[in-house]
Amino acid sequence: DIADYMGQIKAQASSLCLTKGICLQLETGANLGTLKADKLLLERAIMNVISNALDHSPPQGTIYVTVQKTDCFLHISITDEGGGFTPEALHHAQEQFFMGDKSRTSNMHFGMGLYITSSIIKQHGGQLVLSNSKKTGGAQVIIKIPY
């Protein structure tokens, strides 16, 4: 069940959020049913995006995760309240080794997160859509997977 699966991911991510004082809100649509996917790979993709959102969220900020089905796709939208994507990042963030934030060139960041996420989603026949949220001004990443 997709709602239960996303609840488990929220529980895992919430402990990371608590250490940074960030609230994680999960909203799932009704009657989502089940999804045929590699659950571990999909979890890694979702956690990569949530981790990025955590890194770019302001203190006491909120990360919004919404899950809904439209047409033949499941949409998992992850939106933060940070500064959003630069125009350059919108075009290149899914490329290997791209780092939009040059201050993050530490041993912990290699510019692989969204590249790996995009690769996982493509393996599932899906698409990763990057934009800036009109609601929060922050980054919005939508994972679209065929249902």
Question: Could you tell me what each predicted segment is?
Answer:
Residues 60-72:
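Short beta-strand/loop element within the Bergerat-fold HATPase_c
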Residues 18, 23-33:
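Conserved catalytic submotifs in the C-terminal HATPase_c
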Residues 1-11, 25:
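A conserved beta-strand-to-alpha-helix junction within the catalytic ATP-binding
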Residues 85-99:
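Short conserved segment of the HATPase_c
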Residues 80:
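Acidic ATP/Mg2+-coordinating residue in the GHKL
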Residues 125-127:
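Conserved glycine-rich
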Residues 53-54:
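Short helix-loop "hinge" at the ATP-lid/N-box region of the Bergerat-fold HATPase_c
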